[in-house]
Amino acid sequence: MEPCDLLIHSATQLVTCAGPPGLRRGPAMRELGVIRDGAVAIRGSTIVAVGPGTDVRRRFRASHEIDARGRAVCPGLVDCHTHIVYAGDRVEEFEQRCAGATYQEIMAAGGGILRTMRLTRAATTTELVHAALPRLRQMLSFGTTTAEVKTGYGLERDAELRQLAAIALLDAAQPIELVPTFLAAHAVPPEFTGRADDYIDLVVESMLPLARDWYAVSSFAARAIPLFVDVFCERGAFDVAQSRRVLDAARSLGLPRKAHVDEFVELGGLAMALELGATSVDHLDVTGPSAFTALAASSTVAVLLPLVSLNLGLSHFAAARAMIDAGVAVALSTDANPGSAPSLSLPLTMAIACRYLRMLPAETLIATTVNAAYAIGRGGHVGALMPGMQADLLILAADDYRWLMYELGGMPVAQVIKRGQVVVTNE
């Protein structure tokens, strides 16, 4: 018999999400590779075998075993769009929205992103780390084992670089594997009011090269984890021409690209982002069906963020059903942030996607594992249970994976395993 460090066996459902390399589209988003009475063998941080329990247990002798009888086991979840490094909160603005104020009205009055900017600029790197750690612990308890984290609340050189430094420290301080994104073009800072082009000059000519230089000597680069560059292409933020400058500069620096597009208004940012080879385009709440063919023909992931529409009390959600049926590779994420989506729960995101985006439970799982991993450059490493992949798994407090989406606001995760180690036990 071969030795292994951990053997999880007797799973009522072993949901592998296994399949050929690459994004899942259309019917493939419903193929979960479920094994009844399944087992997973782990050596170090890597999966070495997946299959029927009798086969795997006959082959491996384990230092430690977990009996998953009566449980479903699935890949760790991937949250591919978050803004969790910031100072302060927006509790008062929440009440303003309850009284009828819109997101755009609050932002125009100096709130929203700009309020968080002021508090984040005043915070030290250590303070940002201490503020974000409890958020990451909560994400982990909900089953997130890999997460993208953006800057974008500094909106000036030093504060944006402090956010990058905080992300690196957070990556080393807790189990969730982080992927950094530089989002200096998140909003026009107040000192550049009426001069958005001048701010883009600063981002392109100074901030992006500094971010690239920071990344080159970072622990992320040493592990081949990418640094993405993102831009908020939206009315009241940056127009298509300004957004193009940011993404074009990122391409020139050899950095992969993302874009917030079509959240409130279709400006043409989606076509621009596809032209520039964006890894993902995020939000797409008002994207019309005429764009789906080009999106489906691309290698770009459509990252949908339904908690934003829910939290803002909007009547429309991204057209996920039509996108999937058209062959678009769809991912889901929390968009965890202090204003438009103050939630850290991917299971809640999946539950809302089933109810309001007309996605099937299996599709939401692929959208938060395989496709989400590709949306942040981690496809083939995390997001599925296959030999050679990182041993990131969830043992659910139920015998059916659909409890992840069925229960609204619950805690369906019994144990979280990251890189072969049990890091959370919720029971």
From Swiss-Prot:
<feature type="binding site">
    <location>
        <position position="260"/>
    </location>
    <ligand>
        <name>Zn(2+)</name>
    </ligand>
</feature>
<feature type="binding site">
    <location>
        <position position="339"/>
    </location>
    <ligand>
        <name>N-formimidoyl-L-glutamate</name>
    </ligand>
</feature>
<protein>
    <recommendedName>
        <fullName>Imidazolonepropionase</fullName>
        <ecNumber>3.5.2.7</ecNumber>
    </recommendedName>
</protein>
<dbReference type="Pfam" id="PF01979">
    <property type="entry name" value="Amidohydro_1"/>
</dbReference>
<comment type="function">
    <text>Catalyzes the hydrolytic cleavage of the carbon-nitrogen bond in imidazolone-5-propanoate to yield N-formimidoyl-L-glutamate. It is the third step in the universal histidine degradation pathway.</text>
</comment>
<dbReference type="InterPro" id="IPR006680">
    <property type="entry name" value="Amidohydro-rel"/>
</dbReference>
<comment type="pathway">
    <text>Amino-acid degradation; L-histidine degradation into L-glutamate; N-formimidoyl-L-glutamate from L-histidine: step 3/3.</text>
</comment>
<dbReference type="GO" id="GO:0019556">
    <property type="term" value="P:L-histidine catabolic process to glutamate and formamide"/>
</dbReference>
<comment type="similarity">
    <text>Belongs to the metallo-dependent hydrolases superfamily. HutI family.</text>
</comment>
<keyword id="KW-0378">Hydrolase</keyword>
<keyword id="KW-0369">Histidine metabolism</keyword>
<dbReference type="GO" id="GO:0050480">
    <property type="term" value="F:imidazolonepropionase activity"/>
</dbReference>
<keyword id="KW-0479">Metal-binding</keyword>
<feature type="binding site">
    <location>
        <position position="335"/>
    </location>
    <ligand>
        <name>Zn(2+)</name>
    </ligand>
</feature>
<feature type="binding site">
    <location>
        <position position="340"/>
    </location>
    <ligand>
        <name>4-imidazolone-5-propanoate</name>
    </ligand>
</feature>
<feature type="binding site">
    <location>
        <position position="153"/>
    </location>
    <ligand>
        <name>4-imidazolone-5-propanoate</name>
    </ligand>
</feature>
<dbReference type="GO" id="GO:0005506">
    <property type="term" value="F:iron ion binding"/>
</dbReference>
<feature type="binding site">
    <location>
        <position position="260"/>
    </location>
    <ligand>
        <name>Fe(3+)</name>
    </ligand>
</feature>
<keyword id="KW-0862">Zinc</keyword>
<dbReference type="InterPro" id="IPR011059">
    <property type="entry name" value="Metal-dep_hydrolase_composite"/>
</dbReference>
<feature type="binding site">
    <location>
        <position position="335"/>
    </location>
    <ligand>
        <name>Fe(3+)</name>
    </ligand>
</feature>
<keyword id="KW-0408">Iron</keyword>
<feature type="binding site">
    <location>
        <position position="83"/>
    </location>
    <ligand>
        <name>Fe(3+)</name>
    </ligand>
</feature>
<dbReference type="GO" id="GO:0008270">
    <property type="term" value="F:zinc ion binding"/>
</dbReference>
<feature type="binding site">
    <location>
        <position position="90"/>
    </location>
    <ligand>
        <name>4-imidazolone-5-propanoate</name>
    </ligand>
</feature>
<dbReference type="GO" id="GO:0019557">
    <property type="term" value="P:L-histidine catabolic process to glutamate and formate"/>
</dbReference>
<keyword id="KW-0963">Cytoplasm</keyword>
<dbReference type="GO" id="GO:0005737">
    <property type="term" value="C:cytoplasm"/>
</dbReference>
<feature type="binding site">
    <location>
        <position position="153"/>
    </location>
    <ligand>
        <name>N-formimidoyl-L-glutamate</name>
    </ligand>
</feature>
<feature type="binding site">
    <location>
        <position position="186"/>
    </location>
    <ligand>
        <name>4-imidazolone-5-propanoate</name>
    </ligand>
</feature>
<dbReference type="Pfam" id="PF22039">
    <property type="entry name" value="HUTI_composite_bact"/>
</dbReference>
<feature type="binding site">
    <location>
        <position position="81"/>
    </location>
    <ligand>
        <name>Fe(3+)</name>
    </ligand>
</feature>
<feature type="binding site">
    <location>
        <position position="81"/>
    </location>
    <ligand>
        <name>Zn(2+)</name>
    </ligand>
</feature>
<dbReference type="InterPro" id="IPR032466">
    <property type="entry name" value="Metal_Hydrolase"/>
</dbReference>
<dbReference type="InterPro" id="IPR005920">
    <property type="entry name" value="HutI"/>
</dbReference>
<feature type="binding site">
    <location>
        <position position="83"/>
    </location>
    <ligand>
        <name>Zn(2+)</name>
    </ligand>
</feature>
<feature type="binding site">
    <location>
        <position position="337"/>
    </location>
    <ligand>
        <name>N-formimidoyl-L-glutamate</name>
    </ligand>
</feature>
<dbReference type="InterPro" id="IPR054418">
    <property type="entry name" value="MQNX/HUTI_composite_N"/>
</dbReference>
<feature type="binding site">
    <location>
        <position position="263"/>
    </location>
    <ligand>
        <name>4-imidazolone-5-propanoate</name>
    </ligand>
</feature>
